[in-house]
Amino acid sequence: MNHLTGLSRLSADSITGLLDTAAGFKQTLRSPNASFSPTLKNRRIALVFFENSTRTRFSFEIAARNLGAGTLGFSAASSSVSKGETLSDTIKNLEAMQVDAFVLRHPSSGSAKLISRITPKPVINAGDGSNEHPTQALLDMFTLREHFGSLKGLKVTIIGDVLHSRVARSNIYGLLRAGAEVGLCGPVTLIPPDAEKLGVRLFTDLDRAIAWADTAIVLRLQLERASGTYLPSLEEYSRHYGLTDERLERTGKHLLVLHPGPINREIEISNHVADRIQPPGYSKSMLLEQVTNGIAIRMAVLETLLGGTP
């Protein structure tokens, strides 16, 4: 594996290898005075983010530093991009500064793949438009595997704005390859028209989707995109597709709940469901555990792509 631009073509063995490597890092992270071998000492990793990020950017920075690498921050507004420099030229110039790897977030779908074709340095996709977000899916899969023991045969329902979600796409590819069953639930206007061709189940009724599933990944309703013809109103969306205690109690199902963040509270998920990490209740939130697991997964990705002698 030279790059990680998506999960659509990543083999099941490669996915398992990354999850296994992350498990080793997670075990060390649990230690009070966790320390790691500086396998990436003297490596420089450019965090090239053209969109805002909290969890992904900071966890990549922590992951890199845990392994001894240095990171270079990047802001499009304060770079030559604001003067018209292209993405390709930006990458080529950073490469000339002896950068060893690129972590790229960009609003254009396919941008990570494009960059991987013009540089021999590893490119890690931290989210490209509505295309993919592979490390988020890997940390979701890692979280589920840690809880259930295996992904094979696990029924995972992905709820909400699937149409615009790069997280959903990467999760669909990765979960299916790992042997899980995947269901998609949301308004017809927010489900990709070709979704069934991917081998997933489709639900428009959230109660039925919950009753079928072992766990749910709730997606952020992308308010900047999902408006107008996609949704009549936020109130109607929340009434039909918001995950609440009342809905879970009605189905009688105890559900493990994931969300990639950031959360639109009381729209796609209630405060109680988002914050409940202990019983009693009909759900258990894994949201903060996902954030913790993101460090281990991103360490595994960096180690896999860059480990060894420079």
Curated annotation (Swiss-Prot):
User: Origin organism of this chain?
Assistant: Chlorobium phaeovibrioides (strain DSM 265 / 1930) (Prosthecochloris vibrioformis (strain DSM 265))
Residue ranges annotated as transmembrane are none
Cellular component, GO annotation: cytosol
Q: Does the keyword NAD apply?
A: no
Q: Name one GO molecular function term.
A: aspartate carbamoyltransferase activity
One family name in Pfam for this protein: OTCace
**Might you give the EC number(s) for this enzyme?**
2.1.3.2
What is the role of this chain?
Catalyzes the condensation of carbamoyl phosphate and aspartate to form carbamoyl aspartate and inorganic phosphate, the committed step in the de novo pyrimidine nucleotide biosynthesis pathway.
Gene3D superfamilies xref list: Aspartate/ornithine carbamoyltransferase (3.40.50.1370)
Q: Which family does it belong to?
A: Belongs to the aspartate/ornithine carbamoyltransferase superfamily. ATCase family.
Kindly report, in one word, the top-level EC class recorded for this enzyme. transferase
InterPro entries registered for this protein in UniProt: Asp/Orn_carbamoyltranf_P-bd (IPR006132), Asp/Orn_carbamoylTrfase (IPR006130), Asp/Orn_carbamoylTrfase_sf (IPR036901), Asp_carbamoyltransf (IPR002082), Asp_carbamoyltransf_Asp/Orn-bd (IPR006131)
- The residues listed in the UniProt record as binding carbamoyl phosphate, with positions renumbered to this chain, are R55, T56, R105, H133, Q136, G261, P262
Would you tell me the protein name for this molecule?
A: Aspartate carbamoyltransferase catalytic subunit
Which keywords annotate this record?
A: Pyrimidine biosynthesis, Transferase
GO term, biological process aspect, one: 'de novo' pyrimidine nucleobase biosynthetic process
Positions of disulphide bridges: none
Reaction(s) catalysed (UniProt annotation) = carbamoyl phosphate + L-aspartate = N-carbamoyl-L-aspartate + phosphate + H(+)
Give me the residues that bind L-aspartate, please: K83, R166, R220
Under the subunit heading, UniProt states:
Heterododecamer (2C3:3R2) of six catalytic PyrB chains organized as two trimers (C3), and six regulatory PyrI chains organized as three dimers (R2).
Pathway assigned in UniProt:
Pyrimidine metabolism; UMP biosynthesis via de novo pathway; (S)-dihydroorotate from bicarbonate: step 2/3
